[in-house]
Amino acid sequence: MAVTLDSPSPARKRRPLVVGSFESPKLSSDTKLTRSLFLASHEISSMQPLPFILRRNSLSLIRKVKILASVFDELLLPRSQLVVYSQSAHLCFEEMQIVMQRIKSLIDDCSRVSKLWLLLQIDIVAFNFHELVTDLSTVLDILPLHDFDLSDDAQDLISLLTKQCSDSVQFVDARDVALRRKVTDTIAGIKHQISPDHSTLIKIFNDLGLSDSASLTDEIQRLEDEIQDQIDDRSKSAAASLIGLVRYSKCVLYGPSTPAPDFRRHQSLSDANIPADFRCPITLELMRDPVVVATGQTYDRESIDLWIQSGHNTCPKTGQVLKHTSLVPNRALKNLIVLWCRDQKIPFELYGDGGGEPAPCKEAVEFTKMMVSFLIEKLSVADSNGVVFELRALAKSDTVARACIAEAGAIPKLVRYLATECPSLQINAVTTILNLSILEQNKTRIMETDGALNGVIEVLRSGATWEAKANAAATLFSLAGVSAYRRRLGRKARVVSGLVDLAKQGPTSSKRDALVAILNLVAERENVGRFVEAGVMGAAGDAFQELPEEAVAVVEAVVRRGGLMAVSAAFSLIRLLGEVMREGADTTRESAAATLVTMCRKGGSELVAEMAAIPGIERVIWEMIGAGTARGGRKAASLMRYLRRWAAGDTHNTAAETQSIVVPTPSRIFSPVL
């Protein structure tokens, strides 16, 4: 679609780029009110006019405020008597205070927003500037000048300003209009697969003050923020088209980017303190797709689906019978989660690959295809690192980009860089494959591409850096999301040993990726024995201090799906699990309790005796029963029953019945890596 501006911009979730309403702060005296206006007018007077778009509008308004600032200077001169204004004068100054706040907010907003987005809104924003001048004119018209002891010069300035404001008309610079037309024509041409002329692109971005790769990168970030702030599909599509234009222009005009030496992945969810309201009551993990059940409780869709499909007809949290099994999306909560992730610098896929995402506009898709084609052609030249980094960043951005990159044949070309001796190139290559693997159909492409899987495994085992190894582990985690591939990966000894070694030897972030990948692979029962033989219990035990949540989840999954060999391997961890129950977070405490329940059921009295020997274990169990999560309380109650039967000497069947609780395998919100 061509971007048009025939109608005002739609409502937005944050403060819009329009003037709004403000309440004047309560000031105790006329002197304080005058001083407040003096400070506000001088603050606005010191502001720089907008540099490229709407410059004349902002400059004119700032100059008008400068005239007012000189008047307030005179009003604050020392006087022999207390300043007392009439009621009408006081009200006029309060209204002027509100206008000042609105002027500052509008100029601030225009300075922060994307320049391209501002260009598309010039008619609306120009109206906002004119509206402020009109409001200022109204206040000046009714201002009782005779109430103030002003010099003739000051009164002349007020009269001059009043006339300027009353004569003001809405104005849009013809150069801004022409520049906007160039942008919209360029985007419209893409719809018909007409490649933009490079000289036209250079002229557009130079006129916007975006004349290098860094400024275009910043513009992309501002446009991505704009997409988050818009609430209707039309505006989101317009912003997406602009992002496509800037990405393509940045690449073809200034070449592929080179990553900074200290370039790192975003913060992960495991490092963040997730608000309780954002956690699913079943898994206690960040909800990816929150939905509301019949009782009004909110759960993550995947978790509650599994609960219902397992035959339960009650609400997990309240225990009430569900009158129906319909799930209503909680979009308000999802938006809050997305905003929180953005504030925490945690990438989060706003929609899954399966649906719910607005159909991408044709212009954005065409820009992406053109950019991918340009980058793939560049892969054969010497500076491959910059090209692969650009593909990495593009694959991180959205579903369309992942599909376009894979369809263009990038995966076989990336495979050859997995064995490179250049550490940064290896990291970029494996991370690009990782980001591509998020798309379901790309998992098949990766698994079927000659050398791709073996290349990733080799990076896992002998990568040049811990980051490369960690991203290889994360790639295996992603591929293991398909059941058939999970079995195939689990049969490869190099995968099993590589993940266990990384969990034992790597730094904390790398251990986390390894443990999460192991957790996904042991979801397949036939893989459990191989991991036990490779020493997964020892690796998990060593990680209890650094990564208790992931380590306990791995132990729980292995014990639950493994046989006596798995239980025996976990025997040495019983006391550690008891310590986690005492001091861990809610999610790890209940996971530790569930692990001990499974071990007691499968292992008999010897395991119960070992648990009973933990100092203060009964008190810990009682605390979980009384103050833990619902699932944790049930597991703790089961442990107490085991302890009582053991204490009573009932060793014939210590593994008495335990309530079967169906809980989804702990999952990781998997996000693209930049």
Curated annotation (Swiss-Prot):
> What protein am I looking at?
U-box domain-containing protein 16
Identify one Pfam family in the record. Answer: PUB10_N
Annotated metabolic or biological route of this protein: Protein modification; protein ubiquitination
What does the protein in this record do?
Answer: Functions as an E3 ubiquitin ligase.
Please state the Enzyme Commission number of this protein.
Answer: 2.3.2.27
Q: Does the keyword Secreted apply?
A: no
Instruction: List the InterPro entries.
Output: ARM-like, ARM-type_fold, Armadillo, RING-Ubox_PUB, Ubox_domain, Znf_RING/FYVE/PHD
Q: Enumerate the spans annotated as U-box domain.
A: 273-347
The record's catalysed reaction(s) read:
S-ubiquitinyl-[E2 ubiquitin-conjugating enzyme]-L-cysteine + [acceptor protein]-L-lysine = [E2 ubiquitin-conjugating enzyme]-L-cysteine + N(6)-ubiquitinyl-[acceptor protein]-L-lysine
The GO annotation for biological process reads: protein ubiquitination
The main enzyme category here is: transferase
Q: Which GO terms describe its molecular function?
A: ubiquitin-protein transferase activity
Query: What keywords is this UniProt entry annotated with?
Result: Repeat, Transferase, Ubl conjugation pathway
- The record's ARM repeats, renumbered to this chain, cover 399-438, 441-481, 484-523
